[in-house]
């Protein structure tokens, strides 16, 4: 992602954002091939991201061939037309989003059903704390499915943060766009307005 000076990275905001998200995109490229992508649930602990996938997923094959991967956590918010900022300048039309790209090395890549069961147990603890279900372990109930899956841990090497929450410019300009988003009535625009307004709280006009 282009590191624009209009949107300086906020590490603490990025940490909160990633902790709230329930999916990311694994991007892996086999040597001499095209990048493969899969949308997956994840658990992040410190500098490690744990995921699982189907063994037949082409992205898993790409990871096996090349463990240098990117895990992309993103949230599309809204689109706003240029006229909400400047009637003349068409370049002021923009997308609003939040995104963190983690460059990682894939470690502990495993198809062992017990390893997969452990990863799924940690995922369920994170996504459904306190829920009641048959414990995830090898056996007649989960066994056939566990044997089809793989798990891996992604060791984070570096990250790139870009929160384009509101157009480039002053807090007043951003609040103006948030107001127009609320008035638009389009699905998701009210949530986008909430995010934009929260991002400029405490900023000067």
PLM features: what roles do these ranges have?
Residues 107-205:
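C-terminal edge-of-domain segments
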Residues 1-50:
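An N-terminal domain-cap segment
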Residues 55-119:
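Short, structured beta-strand-loop surface elements
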Residues 50, 70, 103, 151-155:
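Beta-strand secondary-structure signal
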Residues 14-15, 28-32, 39, 59-60, ...:
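Catalytic micro-motifs at enzyme active sites that drive phosphoryl/nucleotidyl and oxygen chemistry
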Residues 21-23, 66-69, 149:
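Short, surface-exposed beta-edge/turn micro-motifs
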Residues 32-34, 42-50, 55-58, 68-69, ...:
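Short, charged/polar surface micro-motifs in flexible loops or helix N-caps
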Residues 15-17, 59-63, 142-147, 152:
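A general structural signal for short secondary-structure junctions and capping/turn motifs
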